[in-house]
Amino acid sequence: MGNCLQRTTRWQLDMQETPWNLRLSAKGRTCRYFRGWSCCHSVEGCSCLPWKNIRTFKARQESPKQNEGMTSAPVQDNANETYTEELCYILVDHEAVRGRPSVNPAEGFYENISNKAERHKESSRGTETEYSVLRFPSPPQPLPSTDDEYELLMPSRFSSHAFQQPRPLTTPYETHFSYPQ
């Protein structure tokens, strides 16, 4: 069994106020925490664990080694600004997902992991957990409004005399078009 790491900064927008109780049953830990975009509704063997990890840190770092434990570096616009990073963890049973063809397009959001990465590494503390990033597509951007936009279509070839003809003066709200003959 492996873990997949999902990082998001908008997860609070997609959630209702839910107490973070780790003693919930496996059925209670499913994707009711993540509405509308989670893989758990479509990938068998995946459950969302209600873990909340908030890291707050200053933009000014005294040593680069202090930042090694962080998953991302802060943007250093102002030395007095404070940044918050929130992580949400999703537990995936790779045994349930592995070995069957992918019929669901939602499963394409997993990063490919090499066979070497699928093995658990033995260490002095026991089996190490490996993380993979789940990638979700961004929502489609709305098209800009075309109410007051106009496009001027010009012929591909112009004759040289079309540019040499004198043009009458026009008011700002009046436009004249001349076509080559």
Swiss-Prot record:
The modification Phosphotyrosine is found at Y150. Phosphorylation on tyrosine residues can be induced by IL6. Phosphorylation is mediated by LYN. The modification Phosphoserine is found at S102. Pfam families: HGAL (PF15666). One of its GO terms (cellular component) is plasma membrane. Highly expressed in normal germinal center (GC) B-cells. Expressed in spleen and, to a lesser extent, bone marrow. InterPro entries: GC_assoc_lym (IPR031364). Residues 117-181 are annotated as: Disordered. It comes from the Eukaryota. It is found in: Cytoplasm; Cell membrane. The gene is Gcsam. Interacts with ACTB and MYH2; the interaction with MYH2 is increased by IL6-induced phosphorylation. Interacts (via C-terminus) with ARHGEF11 (via DH domain). Interacts with ARHGEF12. Interacts with SYK; the interaction increases after B-cell receptor stimulation, resulting in enhanced SYK autophosphorylation and activity. The keyword Cell membrane applies. This is Germinal center-associated signaling and motility protein.
